[in-house]
């Protein structure tokens, strides 16, 4: 008799409530290559043993419920249940544990991040026996990742489309983010691209408001792109935000962008949802559009250390759902992001194979096989003095995005773009000559400013601007 139809008549049904750990805590279990593995930070309620808490997470995120049910006998729980197979205390934290859970692959629909998250981070996060719960990391088996298209194009294809190699790409978010007319918005796009940037960007909440409807914005931005390309001889782009109230409207906007001949569109993947994002990613691959992803709302989910979901999980999910760029923090700017932790999930976005490394917050070895990589975007409170650090931290396969750091230049938008391009070219040249960007960065920028008045003016404006705050979410102590 098959496991799917096997009954437990020989055992008999016994109604009632029993501890989760009797069924779902299995420290002897050896994980399979096909299992999805999860690392949860568990804070049990007082009096709840860690084994019971970990087992409860495994149960409530897979086959379990609060009481024994008769229909358990109509299937094989051993085949389908999640298993808490290891628990370790968190060093330096009281009553906090990392619980490792293995999920059989058959629990998940192929190619659906939506279904994966509905199971793993669904109801269990409101479970009363837990004071707090955080999903720290996932191991996605190759047998599951191969059911996803992933990024529409990936890093190498994007470079080939843009014909730009050997340096980070430069971007700028148009400010003020709300209130500009479509024509004035397009003017700012043109000035920034003409000044030397590769991309400009809609902000995450620019959709289709009364002051600037999406179609008008798309048309004026396309005009700006073509004019800047003609004058500079470089391929340019603007992230046209296709995010909308319905999937149908979102695709309609992407179709219009394709008809205009622009190279890239944008989506807010958390507020828009994974189903919408995956649909847009498939459209972009089929129609030759790059896809920029904004992570608006991520800090609601990932900023608190004890509860929610770490961004490295959201980053993996985005790579599976599909996107060619995603915002990933800056380390040095105004937004949250510890260096080693940020570099950990940057590698998870870009690389094919990433080894387990707890010093960078990576709980599992991850093999993406042939799935294309995602370019991390550094954006938020950065300016020309940050350029050496950003170039050193993120390397060539990145987008460095200066919004206020371009449009806030005292001479205007185009000079702001010139300043950033000169600073970047100086840093890349210095690095290629063997200079130490971390140690000599300020001197490299000062030297470049001697022959670039635009850069000199930018250096003067932002010479004392720093964002010196401790990150809320830090790596755990190792001992």
UniProtKB/Swiss-Prot annotation:
Active site (record annotation): 175 (proton acceptor), 294 (proton acceptor)
GO CC list: chloroplast
Keyword Disulfide bond: yes
Residues modified as N6-carboxylysine: 201
Name of the protein: Ribulose bisphosphate carboxylase large chain
NCBIfam families in alphabetical order: PRK04208.1
Annotated site residue numbers, Transition state stabilizer: 334
GO biological process: photorespiration; reductive pentose-phosphate cycle
Reactions catalysed: 2 (2R)-3-phosphoglycerate + 2 H(+) = D-ribulose 1,5-bisphosphate + CO2 + H2O; D-ribulose 1,5-bisphosphate + O2 = 2-phosphoglycolate + (2R)-3-phosphoglycerate + 2 H(+)
Binding site for Mg(2+): 201, 203-204
Cofactor(s) in the UniProt record: Mg(2+)
Residues with PTM N-acetylproline: 3
EC code(s) of this entry: 4.1.1.39
């Amino acid at each position: 008799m098959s496991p799917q139809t096997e009954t437990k008549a020989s055992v008999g049904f016994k109604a009632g409530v029993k501890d989760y750990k009797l069924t779902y805590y299995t420290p002897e279990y050896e994980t399979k290559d096909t299992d999805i593995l999860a690392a949860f930070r568990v804070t049990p309620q007082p009096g709840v043993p860690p084994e019971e808490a970990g087992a409860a997470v495994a149960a409530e995120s897979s086959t379990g419920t609060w009481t024994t049910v008769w229909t358990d006998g109509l299937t094989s729980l051993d085949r389908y249940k999640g298993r808490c197979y290891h628990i370790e205390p968190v060093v330096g934290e009281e009553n906090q544990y990392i619980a490792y859970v293995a999920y059989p692959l058959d629990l998940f629909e192929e190619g659906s991040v939506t279904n994966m998250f509905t199971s793993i981070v669904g109801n269990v996060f409101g479970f009363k026996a837990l004071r707090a719960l955080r999903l720290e990391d996932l191991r996605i088996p190759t047998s599951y990742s191969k059911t996803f298209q992933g990024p529409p194009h990936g890093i190498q294809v994007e470079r080939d489309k843009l014909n730009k190699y050997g340096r980070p790409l430069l971007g700028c978010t148009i400010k003020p983010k709300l209130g500009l007319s479509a024509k004035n918005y397009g003017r700012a796009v043109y000035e920034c691209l003409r000044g030397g940037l590769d991309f400009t960007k809609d902000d995450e909440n620019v959709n289709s408001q009364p002051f600037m409807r999406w179609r008008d914005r798309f048309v004026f931005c396309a005009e700006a792109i073509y004019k800047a390309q003609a004058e500079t001889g470089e391929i340019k782009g603007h992230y046209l935000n296709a995010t909308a109230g319905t999937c149908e409207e979102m695709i309609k906007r992407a179709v219009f962008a394709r008809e205009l001949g622009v190279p890239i569109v944008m989506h807010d993947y958390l507020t828009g949802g994974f189903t919408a994002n995956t649909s847009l990613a498939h459209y972009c691959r089929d129609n030759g559009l790059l896809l920029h992803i904004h992570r608006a709302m991520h800090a609601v989910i990932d900023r608190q250390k004890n509860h929610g979901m770490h961004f490295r999980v959201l980053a993996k999910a985005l790579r599976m759902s599909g996107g060619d760029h995603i915002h990933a923090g800056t380390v040095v700017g105004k937004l949250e992001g510890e260096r080693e932790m940020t570099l950990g999930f940057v590698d998870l976005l870009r690389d094919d194979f990433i080894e387990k490394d707890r010093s960078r917050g990576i709980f599992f070895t991850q093999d993406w096989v042939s799935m294309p990589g995602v370019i991390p975007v550094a954006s938020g409170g950065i300016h020309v003095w940050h350029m050496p650090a950003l170039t050193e931290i993120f390397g060539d396969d990145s987008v460095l995005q200066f919004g206020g750091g371009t449009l806030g230049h005292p001479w205007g938008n185009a000079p702001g773009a010139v300043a950033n391009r000169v600073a970047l070219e100086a840093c890349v040249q210095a690095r290629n000559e063997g200079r130490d960007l971390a140690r000599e960065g300020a001197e490299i920028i000062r030297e470049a400013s001697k022959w670039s008045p635009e850069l000199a003016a930018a250096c003067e404006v932002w010479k004392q601007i720093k964002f010196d705050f401790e990150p809320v979410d830090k790596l755990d102590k190792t001992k």
